[in-house]
């Protein structure tokens, strides 16, 4: 089985037989290298660990190229089980799914996602597993194309891509406004391939690799100093509410009054130009709010001269569905943004006839949202055009290009109480930092229990609220104008460039075989 899927014929010099124990050790080593990537991401942010963990995979691939797919798959499985272990918290601890169902489901997503590093490893070894120019062309390009496909196929799940580990501490983060997170992915993989080559290279090659690495990483430092967008108008004061409502209480009828009062009091005590409440902060449909509540909220906002927006479920205009929306409550017309990129299994149920029975064991209200539609206009609040995205939507950089180009700032509303006290909320904050860097715009994050934050256009955090506390985070933000190179061209240059590099690696191989 291993031989059949591992790309036989990659390396004629490989032994024809390998002991099962050696194969097992190699697979475990790959999985362990993948698992350690957890510490490259937030909250640990050891960005230098990602190229090292990926270089460990490269070393294993060059030792045993015939098992390339399985080594890449083991690396991916270790990485995604480690990074997404919070899935168990959301399924078992919060949604109430029995452990005997939750535990296997935790492995399903990593088992699927690991296919992409497996296929990327197989493809690179199929082209040429030996350290050299063709490997440097093939491996990083194959890896990035795998990451791109992972973020696109079956609605996509780009969370945990290697490039996010570089946001914002690494010099490579400077490339995000240039080519987005996918260019950073590519450079991480290129760094890993070059790092693994150092051990086998001659002195002249080592010097060349080190000079190239210094130029690439040093250029990232220079790119970080470029201001890709410019201020527009005056700064405004912003207030971001964090209600800290436990997920098991959020939709409870007994806790409804407490939830509504929590956010009313936060609005009443706040003085700012713009205030944003988190995703589904008001746990009722808009037209089901208690009589007078909306007037009270508007009254407090009006007295403070404050624009107010809140996450709240809203029925579709035809009444047949419902939307995960953000409504401008202070505007009598109540314009809204409705989430378009829904979370599979969380906000809609794929294949309900096949897996619908699982939801009978779960406490998961509102799991059948309707998409809001693409190209929704930004909301105008406090004289600013604000492009909203809801929770998981800020995982998709290219989808935010259009909204960001029509707006002066970005805002994300989220409810991360689903994931308990895990790394999920810190990882999600890092995604938002990447979006700020890519678009050169402020990102205002209002979350239920963390990480509520104000992120500057350079991706750095201006202010952040302590998680698991009820508070209102205040600070300043300013609209920006102009487009970063990534906003102009999107992912296409990186994807086409990686395809061209793979083709070049193949052509060089054919040329070499022709000469012999």
From Swiss-Prot:
It is a multi-pass membrane protein. It is an enzyme of class 2 (transferase). Pfam families: CN_hydrolase, LNT_N. GO terms for biological process: lipoprotein biosynthetic process. InterPro entries: Apolipo_AcylTrfase, C-N_Hydrolase, C-N_Hydrolase_sf, LNT_N. It is found in: Cell inner membrane. GO terms for molecular function: N-acyltransferase activity. Pathway: Protein modification; lipoprotein biosynthesis (N-acyl transfer). The keyword Membrane applies. PANTHER family: APOLIPOPROTEIN N-ACYLTRANSFERASE. This is Apolipoprotein N-acyltransferase. It comes from Chromobacterium violaceum (strain ATCC 12472 / DSM 30191 / JCM 1249 / CCUG 213 / NBRC 12614 / NCIMB 9131 / NCTC 9757 / MK).
């Amino acid at each position: 089985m291993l031989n059949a899927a591992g790309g036989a014929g990659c390396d004629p010099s490989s032994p024809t037989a390998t002991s099962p124990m050696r194969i097992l050790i190699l697979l475990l080593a790959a999985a362990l290298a993948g698992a350690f990537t957890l510490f490259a991401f937030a909250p640990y942010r050891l960005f230098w660990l990602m190229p090292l963990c990926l270089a460990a995979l490269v070393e294993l691939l060059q030792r045993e190229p015939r098992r390339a797919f399985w080594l890449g798959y083991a690396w991916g499985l270790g990485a995604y089980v480690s990074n997404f272990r919070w899935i168990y918290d959301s399924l078992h601890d919060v949604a109430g799914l029995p452990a005997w169902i939750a535990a296997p489901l935790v492995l399903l997503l990593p088992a699927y996602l690991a296919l992409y590093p497996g296929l990327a490893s197989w493809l690179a070894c199929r082209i040429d597993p030996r350290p050299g120019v063709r490997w440097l062309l093939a491996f990083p390009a194959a890896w990035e194309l795998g990451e791109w496909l992972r973020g696109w196929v079956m609605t996509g799940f780009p969370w945990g891509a290697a490039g996010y580990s570089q946001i914002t501490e690494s010099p490579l983060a400077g490339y995000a406004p240039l080519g987005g997170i996918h260019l950073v992915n590519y450079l991480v993989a290129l760094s890993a391939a070059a790092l693994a080559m150092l051990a086998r290279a001659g002195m002249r090659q080592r010097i060349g690799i080190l000079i190239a690495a210094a130029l690439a990483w040093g250029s990232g430092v220079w790119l970080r100093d470029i201001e890709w967008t410019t201020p527009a108008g005056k700064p405004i004061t912003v207030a971001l509410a964090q209600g800290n409502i436990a997920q098991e209480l959020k939709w409870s009828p007994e806790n409804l009054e407490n939830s509504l009062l929590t956010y009313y009091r936060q609005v009443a005590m706040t003085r700012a130009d713009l205030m944003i409440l988190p995703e589904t902060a008001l746990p009722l449909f808009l037209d089901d709010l208690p009589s007078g509540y909306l007037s009270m909220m508007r009254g407090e906002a009006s007295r403070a001269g404050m624009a107010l927006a809140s996450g709240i479920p809203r029925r579709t205009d035809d009444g047949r569905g419902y939307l995960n929306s953000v409504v401008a409550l202070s505007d009598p017309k109540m314009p809204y943004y409705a989430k378009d990129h829904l979370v599979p299994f969380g906000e809609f149920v794929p294949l309900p006839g096949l897996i619908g029975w699982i939801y009978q064991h779960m406490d998961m209200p509102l799991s059948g949202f309707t998409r809001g539609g693409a190209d929704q206009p930004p909301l105008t609040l406090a004289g600013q055009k604000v492009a909203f995205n809801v929770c998981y939507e800020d995982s998709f950089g290219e989808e935010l290009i259009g909204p960001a180009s029509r707006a002066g700032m970005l805002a994300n509303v989220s409810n991360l109480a689903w994931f308990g006290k895990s790394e999920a909320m810190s990882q999600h904050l890092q995604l938002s930092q990447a979006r700020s860097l890519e678009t050169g715009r402020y990102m205002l994050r209002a979350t239920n229990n963390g990480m509520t934050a104000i992120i500057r256009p350079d991706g750095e955090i201006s202010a952040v609220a302590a998680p698991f506390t009820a508070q209102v985070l205040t600070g300043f933000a300013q609209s920006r104008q102009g487009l970063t190179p990534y906003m102009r061209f999107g992912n296409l240059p990186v994807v086409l460039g990686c395809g061209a590099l793979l083709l070049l690696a193949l052509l060089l191989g054919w040329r070499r075989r022709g000469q012999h």
